[in-house]
Amino acid sequence: MCTGLALETKDGLHLFGRNMDIEYSFNQSIIFIPRNFKCVNKSNKKELTTKYAVLGMGTIFDDYPTFADGMNEKGLGCAGLNFPVYVSYSKEDIEGKTNIPVYNFLLWVLANFSSVEEVKEALKNANIVDIPISENIPNTTLHWMISDITGKSIVVEQTKEKLNVFDNNIGVLTNSPTFDWHVANLNQYVGLRYNQVPEFKLGDQSLTALGQGTGLVGLPGDFTPASRFIRVAFLRDAMIKNDKDSIDLIEFFHILNNVAMVRGSTRTVEEKSDLTQYTSCMCLEKGIYYYNTYENNQINAIDMNKENLDGNEIKTYKYNKTLSINHVN
């Protein structure tokens, strides 16, 4: 599961982030990698050297960093979301192509490119390969949302047919089916409105709304990918932007909280609870990574620009899931 979101504030800042909906912890922490840093996979000997500094949520496996979402020093953000059934990775490298292991795709994007347009150009010759980070750890079925400080966003999906790159003017991504299906599905909700429905005369009977919100009657409320896509797309569009960036930051979290999963509400066939482990929000211009967790609603912030971008080591920040309460008496 998972939901991705990108939006622009009234002052022209760009916020990008996601809900991480998963039934288990993956030992995640916030990871900072300086520019010009060489990452070497001990298992398959593949290497990657960062052109740009990277900050995001992920895990380090045998000294090699992998990311669920993050951004780089140039204001390019990327998030990987579950994409079951439809995804089809290449089984082997293709000669003449840029072959990218699945686990490395997000880091490859953030380490090498400064804009969505640069990524789109590079993807014209890319091949996403089903090479795991380790023989004991299979790849996750993923598609990716990528956004930058120009406000442009794309979705990258590798299916049986080809590697698809969609322009994302909606600013939202969830899971399967494919992104173009979700966009077409928006047409089913053309009748939704943000304003209250006026009184209606049904023959001689006057019908009056009994409460606010009648304009969005029919907005889906379940946790399926299709319903979450619709709900976030409309809430994003309805959002009233504020003169204070801090308020828009809070609005970002409120939108994603509207599709956050409560423990027990969404159970897998194995009776495990799919829940929103964390919500992230990155200010792409400022280089600040904000997040809160299922156990702790307090917003945490890590500022990339307070780190040494030319450092010589990876730095991690502990994932904060300890409940914090502001006692006022």
UniProtKB/Swiss-Prot annotation:
Its keywords, alphabetically, are:
Hydrolase, Lipid metabolism, Transferase
- This entry's Enzyme Commission designation comes to 2.3.1.-, 3.5.1.24, 3.5.1.-
Q: Which GO terms describe its molecular function?
A: chenodeoxycholoyltaurine hydrolase activity; choloylglycine hydrolase activity; transferase activity
Q: What happens when the gene is disrupted?
A: Cells lacking this gene continue to express conjugated bile acid hydrolase activity at 86% of wild-type levels.
* Impact reported for residue 2 to A: Loss of both hydrolase and acyltransferase activities
How does this polypeptide assemble, per the annotation?
A: Homotetramer. The tetramer consists of a dimer of dimers.
Question: What name has this protein been given in UniProt?
Answer: Bile salt hydrolase/transferase
Question: Which organism's genome codes for this protein?
Answer: Clostridium perfringens (strain 13 / Type A)
